[in-house]
């Protein structure tokens, strides 16, 4: 299968991505069909072993069977870390806030979340969670690498997701972006989508209380706590460098879990048929 697109992918492409015999073509600077023809012609000139190697690259993609949980309250800077430190990794971001903001804009509701729009906002929030859940299921079905972005207030939900992913052979990590309450409140005031102050305080307290539990859920060496109380300039330099080193070192390791290796073996056998 060859997916042809210019701007955005749909659910079909997301489902087949990294599956056997799937080639994805994003047409940057050309028409999709023409680019696809060039790829096909290039593959025709390869030997059987070279062709098999080309197909196997998807199975051994660095992000396969890797899951990174991102934790931190409103104003912690975790979204900036997601957009910057994970850029170019190919990992799939699971974040209900993205779907929520998109839904609010489509419904002409304010992203500053005023009290008078709470009823309609909650309806959109539920839809956003359903959409995110469907995306998560599709990504996991293909064993794609994940970035699960949340405040991580709900400890039991995080534990359930970790248990599920580990049962499928995933290697789970956490990046905890930590700030004090004063910094979180100030950054919340400066962000486009402000959260009511009482929610920032409540979320900050709950997330802080969960740090110890997170350290028990994620084994030593698989949790990074980032101090993000410093200036924006320091965030761009030292903080992102620390996060990038942690992420890249984990992505360089191939899956060692027996469940993951069994799944990869099965996928390779399907390719040989």
How would you name each of these model-derived features?
Residues 166-187:
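Conserved phosphate-donor/acceptor-positioning beta-strand/loop module used by diverse small-molecule
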Residues 82-144, 156:
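Conserved substrate/cofactor phosphate-moiety recognition/catalytic segment
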Residues 58-65, 139-140:
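Phosphate-binding P-loop
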Residues 149-158:
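Acidic, metal-coordinating catalytic cores used for nucleic-acid/nucleotide bond scission
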Residues 73-74:
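The conserved Walker
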Residues 67-69:
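Short hydrophobic/aromatic beta-strand immediately N-terminal to the Walker A/P-loop
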Residues 78:
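Conserved lysine of the Walker
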Residues 3-51, 58, 214-273:
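NTP-dependent small-molecule kinase module
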């Amino acid at each position: 299968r060859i997916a042809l697109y210019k701007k955005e992918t749909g659910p079909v492409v997301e489902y087949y991505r990294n599956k056997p015999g799937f080639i994805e073509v994003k047409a940057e600077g050309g028409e999709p069909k023409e680019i696809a023809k060039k790829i096909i012609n290039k593959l025709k000139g390869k030997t059987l072993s070279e062709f098999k190697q080309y197909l196997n690259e998807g199975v051994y993609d660095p992000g396969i069977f890797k899951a990174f949980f991102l934790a931190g309250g409103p104003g912690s800077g975790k979204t900036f870390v997601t957009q910057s430190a994970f850029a170019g990794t190919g990992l799939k971001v699971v974040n209900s806030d993205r779907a929520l903001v998109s839904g609010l804009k489509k419904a002409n509701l304010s992203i500053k979340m005023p009290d008078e729009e709470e009823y309609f906002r909650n309806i959109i929030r539920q839809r956003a969670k359903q959409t995110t859940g469907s995306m998560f299921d599709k990504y996991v079905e293909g064993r794609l690498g994940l970035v699960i972005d949340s405040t991580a207030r709900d400890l039991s939900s995080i534990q359930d997701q970790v248990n599920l992913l580990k049962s499928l052979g995933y290697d789970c990590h956490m990046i905890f972006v930590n700030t004090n309450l004063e910094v979180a409140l100030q950054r919340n005031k400066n962000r486009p989508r402000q959260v009511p102050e009482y929610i920032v305080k409540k979320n900050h307290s709950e997330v802080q209380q969960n740090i110890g539990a997170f350290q028990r859920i994620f084994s030593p060496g698989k949790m990074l706590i980032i101090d993000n109380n410093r200036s924006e300039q320091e965030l761009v330099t030292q903080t992102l460098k620390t996060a990038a080193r942690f992420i890249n070192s984990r992505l360089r390791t191939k899956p060692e879990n027996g469940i993951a290796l069994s799944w990869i073996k099965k996928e390779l056998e399907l390719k040989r048929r």
